[in-house]
């Protein structure tokens, strides 16, 4: 019987993580693994290049994974205020911290705001032998909090120190992953400088 692998992504837009994923997908043993790619949204110029052996599914409330400055207000109001008005209070607390902070504290508050929003997402259905958070920190948070898996691996495609990240928060999530894969020596160095263990 094949083992089940879930790869957590965001979209298949033309970007470094997506291109790297396609290369990674070429090396999966599909005789050993039943693979599902879980995306926030089933879109992107590279979507057609996903191997046919990979089943593609979308996350409920996936727009939360795609929050950015341009759409944050709309997405957060839709997922907080309209669904459950009481959820607005943590949002307001994090928003105030963002507004009144600068530098590292502001970056930390932005991560906490997003994490608070992600916590409202429905869990991923099914159980997996392996969950791979391939698109970075947001997918790692989702894989740890929302996916039932025996093992987890996180891929880092970004400089850990930019924007500043809250070490205590990230360490908590890294500890729940069996392995952290860095895609370059520079990324490995930036992670090691902040979290040497």
Role assignments for model-derived ranges:
Residues 17-28, 42-49:
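Short amphipathic alpha-helix
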Residues 33-104:
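N-terminal strand-loop element at the rim of the active site
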Residues 107, 119-136, 153:
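Short N-terminal targeting/anchoring amphipathic segment
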């Amino acid at each position: 019987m094949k083992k089940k692998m879930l790869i957590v992504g965001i979209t298949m837009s033309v970007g470094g993580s997506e291109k790297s994923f396609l290369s990674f997908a070429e090396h999966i043993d599909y005789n050993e693994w039943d693979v599902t790619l879980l995306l926030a949204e089933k879109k992107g110029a590279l979507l057609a290049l996903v191997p046919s052996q990979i089943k593609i599914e979308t996350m409920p409330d996936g727009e939360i994974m795609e929050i950015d400055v341009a759409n944050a207000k709309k997405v957060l109001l839709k997922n907080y205020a309209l669904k459950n008005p009481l959820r607005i209070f943590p949002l307001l607390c994090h928003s105030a911290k963002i507004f009144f902070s600068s530098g590292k504290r502001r970056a930390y508050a932005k991560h906490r705001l997003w994490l608070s929003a992600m916590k409202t997402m429905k869990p991923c259905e099914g159980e997996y032998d392996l969950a791979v958070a391939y698109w970075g920190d947001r997918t790692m948070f989702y894989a740890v909090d929302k996916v039932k898996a025996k093992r987890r691996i996180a891929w880092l495609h970004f400089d850990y120190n930019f924007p500043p990240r809250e070490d205590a928060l990230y360490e908590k999530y890294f500890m729940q992953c069996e392995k952290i894969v860095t895609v370059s020596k520079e990324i490995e160095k930036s992670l090691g400088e902040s979290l040497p263990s």
